[in-house]
Amino acid sequence: MKIKQIKQSLSLLLIITLIMSLFVPMASANTNESKSNAFPFSDVKKTSWSFPYIKDLYEQEVITGTSATTFSPTDSVTRAQFTVMLTRGLGLEASSKDYPFKDRKNWAYKEIQAAYEAGIVTGKTNGEFAPNENITREQMAAMAVRAYEYLENELSLPEEQREYNDSSSISTFAQDAVQKAYVLELMEGNTDGYFQPKRNSTREQSAKVISTLLWKVASHDYLYHTEAVKSPSEAGALQLVELNGQLTLAGEDGTPVQLRGMSTHGLQWFGEIVNENAFVALSNDWGSNMIRLAMYIGENGYATNPEVKDLVYEGIELAFEHDMYVIVDWHVHAPGDPRADVYSGAYDFFEEIADHYKDHPKNHYIIWELANEPSPNNNGGPGLTNDEKGWEAVKEYAEPIVEMLREKGDNMILVGNPNWSQRPDLSADNPIDAENIMYSVHFYTGSHGASHIGYPEGTPSSERSNVMANVRYALDNGVAVFATEWGTSQANGDGGPYFDEADVWLNFLNKHNISWANWSLTNKNEISGAFTPFELGRTDATDLDPGANQVWAPEELSLSGEYVRARIKGIEYTPIDRTKFTKLVWDFNDGTTQGFQVNGDSPNKESITLSNNNDALQIEGLNVSNDISEGNYWDNVRLSADGWSENVDILGATELTIDVIVEEPTTVSIAAIPQGPAAGWANPTRAIKVTEDDFESFGDGYKALVTITSEDSPSLETIATSPEDNTMSNIILFVGTEDADVISLDNITVSGTEIEIEVIHDEKGTATLPSTFEDGTRQGWDWHTESGVKTALTIEEANGSNALSWEYAYPEVKPSDGWATAPRLDFWKDELVRGTSDYISFDFYIDAVRASEGAISINAVFQPPANGYWQEVPTTFEIDLTELDSATVTSDELYHYEVKINIRDIEAITDDTELRNLLLIFADEDSDFAGRVFVDNVRFE
């Protein structure tokens, strides 16, 4: 079988061309006549469920009607007609003339042959295809799913299958296909729960299946379109122009401009990102032409910490310097009503910055964002409703600021909308009367599914629930949209990353020239963060200043950051292998030999001298150590790190590398025996040598790299694969040279592939409050996904009672946010409410290995749905580690604290507010803590 185009090269435009006569021979209208833009089919009501699908295919010139003005949506479709739709839509051609069915004499035999070769059709049991029979719903499901799987991958059946009241009536051949068609959103049952498998399919049902199928298999060509991504020095002042009937962003010359870039996280938490090296990296290495400065107002932001505004000024100046548009984001979040008292400084804030820059030659780089996410969130003040009334509230807040900013210039203004800026459709129904206004949309690809169609005409606003469809509605109704925040996770920051879904969204945004800013430039431990976070025992947090080279290395980016960088640049996303690791063990940069000495059993040990020279281990006297053969290394000088007091975990290591530095190229031979609790002595299989040709110029001498594998050194493999202990605490090196008396060794490094060690927690059990842990389970407690610590949660004895326990240590290099490295316990319980309780109380025990500096700050957070899923308890419990000796000490020598945190003073919840879950966060306040802790008797009181 021939296929004209496979998915990667089959653009949607080509698909459309291939299926211009999709419904022929059903259509009697002249398909060569040009259509007017008006939808012509009077028998398809604009309020019908099928209208968006038929309109979608008609506007793309995919289908014709049964006459010039009728579509006959409820007429049946034959098996041949639907086969023609699929084969032409997918660009399939038959490669053989051996028609497989008895009834060859039919108008569609070529398309049927192509579909057969692709595995899309199989025919009837009597050996015929029956082209003129009406196609049933189950047959359509089977053919559509086979077509999808032909171009994509085979789908797995969903774990929870869709139950239909007539499931027993679905033929065996179609049972899996009906389930997969539901997953693909191609077909579903009626409102009464019946699939009606034997009922004939209709033209309108075919339109939905074909429209949706083409959307699913269309290539994402627009991911790589960068023609409109222009810097401010190229595009100049921004304006809105009409393009293809929709308002879109353009430069001074009227040609489309798309902004792509990143949003900071809250500047009060991650303000270190505002530095020159970072802005250079974003502009030059990432290709960003825009940055968004997210200045929170509440949540310890501008309202209580006004100096955060200084970071906004710094960010604007850096954006000017490095040729990026800059969004000044008044980050309305908690509370969700921008008219709340905490936001009362908005007018003055925008006026101050507008006045400061109104005469600046790069003033047009600035974009104003007036309200990040209006929402029902009533944490710290009132929220607003997800309806017209909610939009009226936003509009009431925004209009005076818009009027003031319009008097000072024509900079683009972005306005948020209800339901966390997911409702630009509401803004389109009642827009602000001013020039250069765009409306925000926010989405997270794990939570907000795509839609390739809009709504039927007259759909009430209360039923407009798909975020992408809301964007389509806004565009179709005359307003411009800007995606000022989107992420690759779920909306709560967890789960994913959802890159396939992100590709669909970004392809849509790029196709419609909608600008976008990804959330966010942070090393916080959340999926949507762009940088590698701290996770105890796994990763160190990436510095938000990339350093003098002004580039973050790929491994410093998170999965999301690596993906988004590629999408900003419009290049293929090729993720690095994150299972590879390298650990530098001895670098000799401290001016010492780092524990190395001549081994007591070494031959000619009296002739050998070790020293540190130029931050490398120098060996003198090697003219007595000249065996460079592979197996007879025993006569060579033997060194060992007997004086090294440290150890290193080398789980998964497969190679040991050593830099060899010489005055003149020569041959050097090295054999190695790593040592540790799992391996004391095992003879090397061979010595590894480098020859004259391996050396390259290095400073005043030459350098080569010796690579010793686990095959060369069995001890390396023994330690790296031990199920008990993977620490290397020493190494023995056999060193020989051909004719060099002095050489130096440097950068002794192990590398390999990370092996994931399963963290085994004690049984989770049933969520119970009070939590006493006396049943030997965790009683529902677990690590939150954003926890900086995810070590084993076990039940241990503390002060004569069972307690929840874990080990951890805070890092020496501190992020600015003490929560980033904090253990975060998460507890979910049905019908969790405060009731008449005033406190969260529990016993906290410390078994310290190191605890002499700083403090542990214990925070509590509820995540009630009615409060925007975040309600931080205003008070904390502080443990001053410098005064640990003043704590009560138990009989088992644990430090004991009776923790009480006031929950009565939370104004935004009532006694019967559903709290959903409780987080306990043990934040680092410049402490050196390392050890084990215990939590017991968690309760409300």
Swiss-Prot record:
Under the heading Gene3D superfamilies, the entry gives: Galactose-binding domain-like, Glycosidases
Q: What is its EC number?
A: 3.2.1.4
- Assigned keywords, A-Z: Carbohydrate metabolism, Cellulose degradation, Glycosidase, Hydrolase, Polysaccharide degradation, Repeat, Signal
Q: Which SUPFAM superfamilies match?
A: (Trans)glycosidases (SSF51445), Galactose-binding domain-like (SSF49785)
Looking at the record, the residues that make up the SLH domain are 37-94, 95-158, 161-224
The Swiss-Prot or TrEMBL record annotates one GO molecular function as: cellulase activity
- Similarity comment: family membership: Belongs to the glycosyl hydrolase 5 (cellulase A) family.
Report what the protein is called. Answer: Endoglucanase
Q: What is the lineage of its organism?
A: Bacteria, Bacillati, Bacillota, Bacilli, Bacillales
